[in-house]
Structures are given as C-alpha cells and as structure tokens.
Amino acid sequence: MDDNLYRQRAAEHALRHVESGMTIGLGTGSTATFMLYGLAARLADGRLQRVTGVPTSEVTAALARELGIPLTTLDRQPHLDLALDGADEIDPQLRLIKGLGGAMLREKIVAASAARFVVMAAVSKCVERLGERSPLPVEVVAFGLPLCARRLKALGGAPALRRDRSGAPFVTDEGNLILDCNFGIIADPEALAASICAIPGVVAHGLFLGMASLAVIAGPDGIVELHAPSARQ
C-alpha cells in the first residue's frame, strides 16, 4: 500500500489528541500537510472549535491560512498544548531524525514549547537505529559553511550542501544553509548531538532526542501508538 495513505491515516489518528480550545504546533512536510487538511475539516464542521496553530515554516503558515486555520505566534502563546509533526526516522526510544523538509530549527523550537509532542509517520520511517536510511540535516550559517563542513566530516559525516530544484543552495526560512550528513548508523545519538552543537556556525541539527511523547505509526496492520520510554508504565 502507498506510504501516502499511511501518512494520511497517521495524521488523521493523531488529530484525536487535539481538543477544542488548544493551541498547537503545526509541523512541516507531507504528513503534516495531511494533518492540516484534517484539522481544517474538523474546524469547518464543528468537531473542533477555538483551535489555534503555531506554524513551523512559511509553507505551513501559507497553507494553514488558505485552509482557514487560525494562527498565532510563540510571542503571543509561548506555551503550547500539543505539537504535531512528522519524522524522517524514528527509533524504538522515539528518538528522531527530522529536517529533510528544511524546517528543523522552527520544528524543534515549537516541539520544545509544547506540553506534548506527537509524531505522525508511516511504518517505513521506523528504524532500529538512527541513520539507517536518512542523512542527518545540519543547519549552518553561510559564513561558517567551510568550517562546519570540515568539522562534520571530522566527526565521521559526509556533508553535502542541500540544493533546491534549480540547483541553487537551499535557504531555510531563517536564511541559513543545510548540510545533509551521512553518518551511517549513529551509535550514540546523544554524543553526536553534543559534538555537532559545539561546532561554531551550527544553528540546529535534525536529531530530536527525548522530545517526542508519542508516535502514531500507520502501516498495513493498522495504527500503533508508541509511547516514549519515560511515559511507559
């Protein structure tokens, strides 16, 4: 079955965690797009009321406005009830790789601002160890690009500058560049995250560690909810 159908099913199921009156983080990417359409439908028919969103990208903000989803900012609402977003890889501890959509900095800020962070994904995004399938995106300031690339290579990565469809360097909403780094299997995500953060010029990386409360996974056998280790009984 098509991964898009699983993404849609995961997004629809995740919306069960949204309650009227909530302020929620709105993710970026293909799964988040399904969530936005589902949220808009629930607001339109009255199943949900007074839900306000904080978008994680300009793309998400534009679509939310088009769909009639009320928006706010973290300046006005610094504490969110819930954040909903997709992921590029999810391991059994709900550690994530995110950022292939180019919005990881805002995504991480929004997720950290939420009381609960619910991840939505097709079962194909589940891995035993991070790095099995996805490169690790690292957002860097343009001035620091040469240094960041050298330091990331020294850490064992193979950094490649992300480019847009025209072949020009991809520029994030914050005006930064992204190095997609192939580290292979990441044996110690926490140690790697700390090492990357110590590189001058790094703005953000795609390792989301200890942030997800719940993962909603859709596959051929239906929907599964995976709870973070700290939330398990």
From Swiss-Prot:
Any one of the GO BP annotations: pentose-phosphate shunt, non-oxidative branch
InterPro entries in alphabetical order: NagB/RpiA_transferase-like, Ribose-5P_isomerase, Ribose5P_isomerase_typA_subgr, Ribose5P_isomerase_type_A
Database matches in Pfam families: Rib_5-P_isom_A (PF06026)
UniProt keyword annotations, A-Z: Isomerase
Keyword set includes Ribosomal protein: no
Pathway(s) it belongs to: Carbohydrate degradation; pentose phosphate pathway; D-ribose 5-phosphate from D-ribulose 5-phosphate (non-oxidative stage): step 1/1
GO molecular function, one term: ribose-5-phosphate isomerase activity
Catalytic activity: aldehydo-D-ribose 5-phosphate = D-ribulose 5-phosphate
Enzyme Commission number: 5.3.1.6
UniProt binding sites for substrate: 28-31, 85-88, 98-101, 125
Enzyme class: isomerase
Active-site positions on this chain: 107
Quaternary structure and partners: Homodimer.
Function comment: Catalyzes the reversible conversion of ribose-5-phosphate to ribulose 5-phosphate.
Family membership noted in the UniProt record: Belongs to the ribose 5-phosphate isomerase family.
Name of the protein in question: Ribose-5-phosphate isomerase A
UniProt organism field: Roseiflexus sp. (strain RS-1)
Lineage: Bacteria, Bacillati, Chloroflexota, Chloroflexia, Chloroflexales
Gene name, Swiss-Prot/TrEMBL: rpiA
